[in-house]
UniProtKB/Swiss-Prot annotation:
Catalysed reaction equations from the record: 2-deoxy-scyllo-inosamine + NADP(+) = 3-amino-2,3-dideoxy-scyllo-inosose + NADPH + H(+); 2-deoxy-scyllo-inosamine + NAD(+) = 3-amino-2,3-dideoxy-scyllo-inosose + NADH + H(+)
Domain of life: Bacteria
GN (gene name): rbmC
Chain sites annotated for binding Zn(2+) 2: 89, 92, 95, 103
Protein name: 2-deoxy-scyllo-inosamine dehydrogenase
Gene3D superfamilies, alphabetized: Medium-chain alcohol dehydrogenases, catalytic domain, NAD(P)-binding Rossmann-like Domain
Keyword Metal-binding: yes
Described purpose of this protein according to its UniProt entry: Catalyzes the oxidation of 2-deoxy-scyllo-inosamine (DOIA) with NAD(+) or NADP(+), forming 3-amino-2,3-dideoxy-scyllo-inosose (amino-DOI).
Residues reported in the UniProt entry to bind Zn(2+) 1: 37, 59, 144
UniProt KW Ribosomal protein keyword: no
Species annotation: Streptomyces ribosidificus
One Pfam family this sequence matches: ADH_zinc_N
Length: 340
């Protein structure tokens, strides 16, 4: 089978290897689609946490179960699925508290063990989620990032009638905007430096999309008081965006940290936090939102066409990574079609 391997920082190679055998309790999945997200790009550049080289990247995927090792999950053979990247021990204090992303022995598909940038992948059966026939496999590769967005919105407690601003209109940012609406909130503005991504946000009905330059969102809230958000969801990971979020949110408001960049330090003015009595909360991973993400994608309540901007065959991995890294050609998200 073909498999893309990150051998070392900034060194990727397309390899040919045997189809892997699933271990007991695991399934073998034929991958259909896999999208490239910001964490994959950071991993490629060598600035990511808890990752191991060499490894096959990829954790935003969809595919079909072709084999299962053991009785558990045998009914899934021949069905279309997606899956959680988190491979936790299940026994530590964090796992028993149902916070597996904090597992003391955390493994992650596409980072510490081979992921979905390959024609086949093995995965624990318990990580799989079955897809309805009404959800195309192309759209389904966005179930995982949509679950991340839903989890973040819920961790911040966004409720009906609240105003929300989103920092960053990449894949996660555009999904956050739609997740806010599912909870009855309204997105007053998106801040994003890439013009095509701002256009994508506007096409989703966001009323204002500012440049993403430092101070742009704050200036909007000064000139348009109705745009002052109750909640700011920071999805870009850029250090300056954290300070901007603190300044833009209303007194008594909430700031959610969703995006992050390893090795970069945000310089903040703590008086904004204290004087405005702000709540800052982080969110990581899909939590328990996979099933809902599948449901709303299948129903059409969330659209991902604007996210999946550039399709590539796995053979064209170098161009896929280059376009994504440079945000070239109006790129929002590169993805691999492994059925091609």
């Amino acid at each position: 089978m073909k498999a893309l391997v990150f051998e070392a920082p900034e060194r990727a190679l397309l390899t040919h290897r045997d189809i892997p055998d699933p271990a007991p309790g695991e399934a073998l999945v034929r991958i259909a689609y896999n999208s490239v997200c910001g964490s994959d790009l950071s991993f490629y550049k060598g600035v990511w946490h808890g990752s191991t080289y060499p490894v096959v990247p990829g954790h935003e995927w969809s595919g079909t179960v072709v084999d299962v090792n053991g009785p558990l999950g045998a009914e899934l053979i021949g069905t279309n699925v997606v899956g959680d990247l988190t491979v936790s021990c299940g026994t530590c204090a964090h796992c028993t508290a149902r916070t597996p992303t904090l597992c003391e022995d955390l493994g992650e598909l596409g980072f510490t063990r081979d992921g979905a940038c390959a024609e086949y992948m093995t995965i624990p059966v318990g990580n799989l989620r079955r897809l309805p026939d009404t959800l195309p496999l192309r759209a389904a590769c966005q179930v995982e990032p949509l679950a991340v967005a839903l989890n973040a919105v819920d961790r911040l407690g966004v409720t009906a009638g609240e105003k929300v601003a989103v920092m960053g209109a990449g894949g996660i940012g555009l999904l956050l905007a739609q997740a806010v609406r599912l909870r009855g909130g309204s997105v007053t503005a998106v801040a994003e430096p890439v013009p095509e991504r701002r256009a994508a946000a506007l096409a989703l009905g966001v009323p204002a999309a500012v440049s993403g330059e430092p101070g742009a969102l704050v200036e909007l809230t000064r000139t348009h008081p109705d745009a002052v958000p109750d909640v700011v969801l920071e999805a870009s990971g850029y250090p300056t965006a954290v300070q901007e979020s603190l300044e833009a949110v209303r007194p008594g408001g909430r700031v959610g940290l969703v995006g992050y960049r390893i090795g970069e330090t945000a310089v903040m003015a703590p008086h904004h936090i204290v004087l405005k009595v702000l709540t800052i909360r982080a969110s990581m991973g899909p939590g328990t939102r996979f099933e809902e993400a599948i449901e709303v994608l299948a129903s059409g309540a969330v659209t991902v066409d604007a996210l999946l901007s550039h399709e590539f065959a796995l053979d064209d991995y170098a161009k896929a990574l280059d376009v994504a890294l440079r945000r070239a050609d109006s790129n929002t998200r590169s993805y691999f079609n492994l059925q091609a």
